[in-house]
């Protein structure tokens, strides 16, 4: 009988585990962290993926982040990081208030929401511009409109005409210029990409970004539209679909079919859906991604108090840990690293929390669940990945070394959540960067030229992988390692599994 989760928890040894963290950390770079020195410090603390938030900042700013990231990379030879572009997406916002003043709105206050653009720069507490032309066509009396992440709620009283509706404030608060607007339980018909998004994606392609975090994805067609917009030059960019509204939830299965991965963006999701339900939604979506073998990111307010405080709340630590236990491949920091006072400390706390959470996982029981739930027959590569995970569990192996061109084998290995690190050896920098999306994968760039002797070339790459694992304290002489490689060069031939002993074969 495999060790159950309950048995695993009852027998836990409390303290810092003697292993490396497998959950990746994504950090948003903002004005406080946009320097080579700051990015290097974040990487040393545990950062794996840089996020560029295109809801803020100029092209010049984002260009400088990319340049600083490239400079920082030189201090980590063979360990490239990934850069992700987070689109602004099809958001709805209020207009600019008169003189940019913050408008106080008392409870029960009635006012007009208008789509008349003549009020776009002169909104006041009597009439407020909303930049969604079809607002009066999609909403009905009795529905609610949330402003500024739900800080202010309004009930729709009357549709006056095609441009105006009357609302009543449910609570008191302030409205400032250009605040976000949410329409819960209302199907909006915004295009998946705005003109700004198109320009931003073109910027990303030109500057070699590796991942797109696509905001407010509602259908599979939205994902395909982004893929088309990236064009042939951006065909290798991975698309991570952000699920942050009811439409995205309703169409999740079709989105998962076509996307490269998923981000659970709990901020906007928690506005449109009851906050307690987000807990269950997070677990459900992560499980679906795990079963599909696609990476999933948990994001929003994970260590939010550390924006201004040196220590997180206990609830925040539990939130990070539970996201890891739910099965997230990556956890993400937003304002904590973009504008916070303690960015490096936030990454350190997140890394330490993820590491301890990982030590509580009952890997054999988890592997059995994943294997049993996977439809059969599986592809050759996935069959080998599952067999490698089983071999590690049965032989108490310390590492899996995989030689890969595209990283697909490493992704499938990650799906089965082996109890050891996955050492990815690749000659392709983009493959190494993208691998940070997959839990447990440690990518290493192998730069020597390919030998004419295929067998010798394979041996040298495997030896390199074992040496890298040894240098990071993952393996030592006498340890068992499992390796996966192809019987010939090229893509899609990972079909050979080998069990070796460190210090003998390598």
Curated annotation (Swiss-Prot):
Q: Which GO terms describe its biological process?
A: glycolytic process; pyruvate metabolic process
Keywords noted in UniProt: ATP-binding, Glycolysis, Kinase, Magnesium, Metal-binding, Nucleotide-binding, Phosphoprotein, Potassium, Pyruvate, Transferase
Which positions are annotated as binding Mg(2+)?
A: 244, 268
- Pathway(s) this gene product operates in, as recorded in its UniProt entry: Carbohydrate degradation; glycolysis; pyruvate from D-glyceraldehyde 3-phosphate: step 5/5
Q: Where does ATP bind?
A: 53-56, 93, 179
Question: Which GO molecular function annotations are given, in alphabetical order?
Answer: ATP binding; kinase activity; magnesium ion binding; melatonin binding; potassium ion binding; pyruvate kinase activity
The function of this protein is: May be used by cells under conditions in which the level of glycolytic flux is very low.
The protein in question is named Pyruvate kinase 2
Q: What species was this sequence derived from? A: Saccharomyces cerevisiae (strain ATCC 204508 / S288c) (Baker's yeast)
**Gene symbol?**
PYK2
